[in-house]
Amino acid sequence: MTPLRIGTRGSALATTQTTHVAETLTERSGLAHELVVIRTEGDVTTGSLASLGGTGVFASALRAAVLDGVVDAAVHSLKDLPAAQPETLEIAAVPARADLRDALCARDGLTLATLPEGARVGTGSPRRVAQLKALRPDLELVDIRGNVQTRLARVPGLEQHDDHAPAAAGSPRGDLDAVILA
């Protein structure tokens, strides 16, 4: 039997999430699967997400791969999907929700409350920028791009940012629990 070809972005987090979905499908249906890595505009462009047009920069190549028959299905973070989808595509399943909180990964055990005034916080999310500005208007918020591992690698050396605010859901899937502050 031909394996189900499942499209995924190539980041460690994306392949971990896709592997989880693919293995669950195999367990429940007996279908074999094959992961197919698709490079997206968001993966290869270094500009801010806002300058790239925001939603869809990570999903458009995956959507095209499904429509063109390169893959049979694709797994992607729902938050990055545009609200309007082609009529020929369907969101066929949504896995159980992971941790919905955002996480602060900071040096020396600092928390959002104990960050020094004017601390530099890196995030690529306009939503997180708004939340951080509301809670700590004194912080310097810096646009940051890259996968979770790349962004976290910037924290210990403090070359650019005092800390980083990613989604907590990405952490257990990427084995990053040790750097998340509760």
Predicted regions and their residues:
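Domain-level signature for soluble enzymes in the chorismate/prephenate branch of the shikimate pathway
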Residues: 1-182
